[in-house]
Amino acid sequence: MEINLLDDEGWLERTWPPERPGYVWRRKRVAGEHLGAGLIELPPGESTFPYHYELGNDELLVVVTGTPTLRTPDGERDLEPGDCVLSPSGPEGAHKVTNRSADPARVLLVSNFALPRATVQPDSDKMMARWGAGRDERRWFFLGDDADYWDGEASG
């Protein structure tokens, strides 16, 4: 399986997320059993994902074209083609990539596929737990929705 980072062939396009009509998500994907990569084309003003960090996965960002802005716990900085940034698992790896330039940007995101894993979005205090690859094998919840270990369990 292979993709070319610079050509205009092989893009998958879909309107995503559904609550953002008009935004067309363009990506190319190459994936194995334990490692995957996605090439994402960011139009001006768009972001890859909300500010987040992974628990159980490291992520590597490679800027292919354009000059996107990277937000991390240390602040924001502009990136340029050829820049590679590792976002390790945990809060210190929190990140968001936004294209604030006037031209499209292409970024390659590479990560391992460890399961189970979790994604935390600290700005909205949300978490996603994932235990499989399907959409029905993950759940989003707000971190304030705590339950005790025995809540809902039968006693005895």
Language-model regions, residue ranges each:
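A generic structural motif
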Residues: 48, 58, 65-67, 74, ...
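Short, conserved beta-strand element in jelly-roll/cupin
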Residues: 39-43, 54-71, 110-114
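A short, N-terminal "cap"/entry segment at the start of jelly-roll beta-barrel domains
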Residues: 1-34, 119-156
